[in-house]
C-alpha cells in the first residue's frame, strides 16, 4: 500500500511490510483557532484508537488519505 505521510512536506510513500492501512488523524492544539486542526497522515497496521478530541479515518487503497487541501 502507498499512503500520504506528513513530515517536512506531504509525500506518497510505500508503507512498511505489515502496515497495509493509511490513516488521517486530526486534532486541535493551541493554534486551532488561527491555523485549524493539526493533520497527521501515515501508514498503520491497525486503525488507531480514537482519543478524546481526535478524529481518525483509515482506508486500505493506495493514497486514499490525501490532505484535505489536496482534494479536488
Curated annotation (Swiss-Prot):
Expressed by the venom gland. PROSITE patterns: SNAKE_TOXIN (PS00272). It is found in: Secreted. Transmembrane segments: none annotated. Keywords: Acetylcholine receptor inhibiting toxin, Disulfide bond, Ion channel impairing toxin, Neurotoxin, Postsynaptic neurotoxin, Secreted, Toxin. GO terms for cellular component: extracellular region. GO terms for molecular function: acetylcholine receptor inhibitor activity; ion channel regulator activity; toxin activity. It comes from the Eukaryota. Pfam families: Toxin_cobra-type. Disulfide bonds join 3-22, 15-43, 28-32, 47-58, 59-64. The keyword RNA-binding does not apply. Its main location: secreted. Binds with high affinity to muscular (alpha-1/CHRNA1) and neuronal (alpha-7/CHRNA7) nicotinic acetylcholine receptor (nAChR) and inhibits acetylcholine from binding to the receptor, thereby impairing neuromuscular and neuronal transmission. Belongs to the three-finger toxin family. Long-chain subfamily. Type II alpha-neurotoxin sub-subfamily. This is Long neurotoxin 4. It comes from Ophiophagus hannah.
